[in-house]
């Protein structure tokens, strides 16, 4: 794989802006804060990165999610209409995620390695609701569509870790009046999480890398355009071209477990060589 990207040299003023942004999202390591020549990279991952780990994608060609209509199991209206059905659906997903044969693959580990080098200069955004990035070692992940192993109070919004089944009768006792707990998932018609931080990151990015995404679902499908507007070099790593592949500067196709480690390895090698030459 030959990476066709610009040299990893950056204007000091842009890194000052990066410093302000990073301090808003994550606690910064003082040693990392002193490193001003690392590129600022935004990575977006989708279902394609977890498919090789055994995570089934929800949406089938016929528009059904595990034999259910999307409207029935992935909308606020569906939850209000039949909370038992919705809870059963996500209970099954939760149990599947915790099966012993479900594990991070080489692509997840490669991104954890990238974070280990770039530190706060990497913002990892995922559309996935699994925890495979964290299990691979990534510590700073924005789950824009929520997390399967968490639930939240429908009254206060308090988020709780949750690994077992959840019934429609389960109540959160954080409020004056116990309220139902729902999956901590962004359903259709709801606002994705962390959007202010995401758009700020896209505005500051030197590189935007999209991995395993279809380009069908907005606002994530528009991130490549947004990052382009601010001068980022854009890269698509995917099994096949996405719906927005024409907007990317650079494209590599194949299994995520192969193309992602290869790309990141050469990316870090190239950046390391350029930094030594400064």
Swiss-Prot record:
EC number: 2.3.1.286
Entry keywords, A to Z: Cytoplasm, Metal-binding, NAD, Transferase, Zinc
Gene3D superfamilies registered for this protein in UniProt: SIR2/SIRT2 'Small Domain (3.30.1600.10), TPP-binding domain (3.40.50.1220)
Binding-site list for NAD(+): 46-65, 127-130, 212-214, 238-240, 256
Any one GO molecular-function label of the UniProt entry: protein-malonyllysine demalonylase activity
Domain notes: 2 residues (Tyr-90 and Arg-93) present in a large hydrophobic pocket are probably involved in substrate specificity. They are important for desuccinylation activity, but dispensable for deacetylation activity.
PANTHER family listed in its UniProt record: NAD-DEPENDENT PROTEIN DEACYLASE, NAD-DEPENDENT PROTEIN DEACYLASE SIRTUIN-5, MITOCHONDRIAL-RELATED
UniProt similarity note: Belongs to the sirtuin family. Class III subfamily.
Protein name per Swiss-Prot or TrEMBL: NAD-dependent protein deacylase
Protein's organism: Yersinia pestis
């Amino acid at each position: 794989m030959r990476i066709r990207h610009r040299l990893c040299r950056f204007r000091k003023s842009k890194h000052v802006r990066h410093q302000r942004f990073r301090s808003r999202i994550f606690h910064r390591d003082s040693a990392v804060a002193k490193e001003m020549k690392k590129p600022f990279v935004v990575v977006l991952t989708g279902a394609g990165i977890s498919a090789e780990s055994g995570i089934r994608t929800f949406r089938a060609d016929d528009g059904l999610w595990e034999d259910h209509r999307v409207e029935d199991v992935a909308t606020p209206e569906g939850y209000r209409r039949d909370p038992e059905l919705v809870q059963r659906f996500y209970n099954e997903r939760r149990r599947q995620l915790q099966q012993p044969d479900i594990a991070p693959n080489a692509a997840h580990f490669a991104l954890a390695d990238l974070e280990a080098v770039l530190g706060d200069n990497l913002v990892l955004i995922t559309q996935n609701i699994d925890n495979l990035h964290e299990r691979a070692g990534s510590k700073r992940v924005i789950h824009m569509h929520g997390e399967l192993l968490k639930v939240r109070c429908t009254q206060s919004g308090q988020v709780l870790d949750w690994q077992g089944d959840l019934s429609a009768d389960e109540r959160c006792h954080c409020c004056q009046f116990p309220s139902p707990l729902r999956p901590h998932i962004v359903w259709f018609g709801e606002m994705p999480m962390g959007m202010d931080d995401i758009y700020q990151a896209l505005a500051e990015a030197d590189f935007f890398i999209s991995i395993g995404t279809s380009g069908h679902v907005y606002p994530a499908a528009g991130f490549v355009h947004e990052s382009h507007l601010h001068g980022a070099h854009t890269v698509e790593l995917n099994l096949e071209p996405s719906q927005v592949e024409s907007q990317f500067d650079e494209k590599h196709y194949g299994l995520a477990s192969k193309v992602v480690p290869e790309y990141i390895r050469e990316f870090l090698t190239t950046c390391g060589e350029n930094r030594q030459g400064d």
